[in-house]
């Protein structure tokens, strides 16, 4: 006998497994945050055939409090339970990571906290809020539901992952161009400097939004003309996401390249670089030993400042339908999906 197997095309990540209780069931339509009823009224027929317009109760959350029947008391108890869970987990990790410091002579249990006060306090606030939010999301729709009854909090968290993924991949694509071309232009100079300046000046003269839009539209035409090359919608979405990261990376390296060029031109004139040339050190060794370590502060600062701009660019591009695939969770797609509803139901 031959057996046939069918495989699910959607890939489940660790985040999906963790958040499974928050999104496995869908409501009918919109609902407000922490509400126990749908946002829109429906007609129901009573026992004596009398029709009445009421707000239907939510099926899965909002009416199943875990600790108390009153919502305020239940939320307060949920916060207390979250604190207890946090202190239990924190005490285990605290002792595990700082065992040697705690039990060292002349130290007490609070010594590691004094040494890492800011880090531990910041981490504690993030973890407490995460546990509290997760506990609440099992009982309520913290941010309500959308038009088809999906938990908005779940979509928002998935959208954060999409934004971070785009920012990270775009940075990985952009860094090699910016670092190497910037250093070569500034340190070597001459004809190489002229060519690199011409390249990034030309790229800067092209509006980035139009360039990205044209590239994405070309990709859409290719996918429409070759549907058999993609087994499912997730392959199409992944290709579009990857292509968007490539385009953003190829158009966002020019600013950092210009900064590194100027810094490299300054560093090549300092005494220790001139001394290295005098002792016969080749260009590659000088760049690796002296130039690159002294420009990394500019690279780190630029990456941190531009990361949020890349996430915002994804949201803007998705809003005008030239960003990630509509099936991908992102802030731009969420705003775009709710755009028509803004004129119909502004309060939503």
Give short role names for the model-derived ranges.
Residues 119-123, 145-348:
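Alpha-helical transmembrane segments of integral membrane proteins
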């Amino acid at each position: 006998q031959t057996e046939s197997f069918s495989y699910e095309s959607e890939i489940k990540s660790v985040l999906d497994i963790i958040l499974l209780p928050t999104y496995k069931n869908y409501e009918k339509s919109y609902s407000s945050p922490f509400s126990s009823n749908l946002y829109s009224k429906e007609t129901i027929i009573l026992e004596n055939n009398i029709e009445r317009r009421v707000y239907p109760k939510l099926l899965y959350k909002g009416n199943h409090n875990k600790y108390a029947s009153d919502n305020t008391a239940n939320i307060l108890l949920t916060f207390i339970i979250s604190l207890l869970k946090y202190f239990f987990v924190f005490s285990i990790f605290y002792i595990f990571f700082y065992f040697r410091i705690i039990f060292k002579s002349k130290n007490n249990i609070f010594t590691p906290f004094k040494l890492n006060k800011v880090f531990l306090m910041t981490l504690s606030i993030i973890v407490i809020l995460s546990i509290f939010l997760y506990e609440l999301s099992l009982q309520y729709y913290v941010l309500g539901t959308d038009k088809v009854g999906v938990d908005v909090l779940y979509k928002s968290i998935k959208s954060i992952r999409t934004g971070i993924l785009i920012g990270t991949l775009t940075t990985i694509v952009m860094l090699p161009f910016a670092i190497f071309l910037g250093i070569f232009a500034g340190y070597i100079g001459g004809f190489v400097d002229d060519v690199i300046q011409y390249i990034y000046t030309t790229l800067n003269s092209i509006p980035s939004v139009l360039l990205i839009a044209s590239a994405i539209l070309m990709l859409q035409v290719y996918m429409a003309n070759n549907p058999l090359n993609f087994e499912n919608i997730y392959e199409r979405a992944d290709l579009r996401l990857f292509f968007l990261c490539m385009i953003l990376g190829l158009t966002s390296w020019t600013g950092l390249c210009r900064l590194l060029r100027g810094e490299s031109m300054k560093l090549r004139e300092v005494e220790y670089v001139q001394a290295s040339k005098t002792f016969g050190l080749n260009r590659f060794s000088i760049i690796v030993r002296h130039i690159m370590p002294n420009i990394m502060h500019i690279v780190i600062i630029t990456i941190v400042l531009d990361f949020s701009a890349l996430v915002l660019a994804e949201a803007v591009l998705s809003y005008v339908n030239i960003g990630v695939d509509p099936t991908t969770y992102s802030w731009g797609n969420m705003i775009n999906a709710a755009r028509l509803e803004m004129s119909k139901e502004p309060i939503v």
